[in-house]
Amino acid sequence: MATPHINAEMGDFADVVLMPGDPLRAKYIAETFLQDVRQVNNVRGMLGFTGTYKGRKISVMGHGMGIPSCSIYAKELITDFGVKVIIRVGSCGAVLPDVELRDVVIGMGACTDSKVNRLRFKDQDFAAIADFELVQNAVSAAKAKDIKVRVGNIFSADLFYSPDPEMFDVMEKYGILGVEMEAAGIYGVAAEYGARALTICTVSDHIKKGTQTTSEERQTTFNEMIEIALESVLLLED
C-alpha cells in the first residue's frame, strides 16, 4: 500500500534496495546496470526503480540529502514494503591526506553530530555500524574486481556548510575516511526496524586539498561503487 512518500504497492520493491542521494543517479543506475526495469516511485521526484541484476531482483531509489530525508524513505521501505537490506551508494568528502578523489570508501561505522540516534536510543550513544555480512561481501566483491577500497569510520554531518572547519582537523586525527550526511541515520533506522544496512561512498571532493568532481561526474561516473554494491548483493546468503 502506498505511503505518504512512496506511491508503490507491496511487491513492487525487491528485498534489497540500493539508495543514492540523487534520484537522477538512481535512474542512471537502473538504466545502466539493471534489466527488465520498471519505475515504482515518483512522489516528490524521488525516483525508484525495480529490475534484475544477473537474474537477481534489485531495486534502486533516491533518498535525498541529510538524515531526516533518508530516514523517512528507509523507514517506509522497511516497514511498508518489506525491504530487508539497504545499501547507500553515495558521495563523500575526504580529509585524510592519503584518500584521493574517486577512492571508494566502505563505512563500517558512522560517527555523527546529529541527535537522531540519541532520540531513538533513550539519549544514549548508539554505535551506528554496518551489517558485518554486507561489509564482508562488499570487500570480497571489490577484491574480485580488483578495485581498491578503504574500510573504516565515516562521519555523517547535519550541516553541509560547516560553521566549524576545525572539526575537519579532529576528523583527520581520528582517521575518518569520508564525510557525508546520511549513513548514521540509515544505520539507526535499520537497527530500529530489524533490517540491515551498508554505506559505500565514492570520494567526490577533498575538503583539505580543495579538489572536487563535477555534479555530472557524481551523477554518472561513479561506476566502481555501484558494481561493488551490485556484486555484493549476489553474495548474500538466503
UniProtKB/Swiss-Prot annotation:
The record marks 218 as: Important for catalytic activity. One of its GO terms (biological process) is purine nucleoside catabolic process. GO terms for molecular function: purine-nucleoside phosphorylase activity. Keywords: Glycosyltransferase, Transferase. It catalyses: a purine D-ribonucleoside + phosphate = a purine nucleobase + alpha-D-ribose 1-phosphate; a purine 2'-deoxy-D-ribonucleoside + phosphate = a purine nucleobase + 2-deoxy-alpha-D-ribose 1-phosphate. The keyword Glycosyltransferase applies. A purine D-ribonucleoside binds at residues 5, 180-182, 204-205. Its EC number is 2.4.2.1. The active site is at residue 205. Phosphate binds at residues 21, 25, 44, 88-91. Homohexamer; trimer of homodimers. Catalyzes the reversible phosphorolytic breakdown of the N-glycosidic bond in the beta-(deoxy)ribonucleoside molecules, with the formation of the corresponding free purine bases and pentose-1-phosphate. Belongs to the PNP/UDP phosphorylase family. This is Purine nucleoside phosphorylase DeoD-type. The gene is deoD.
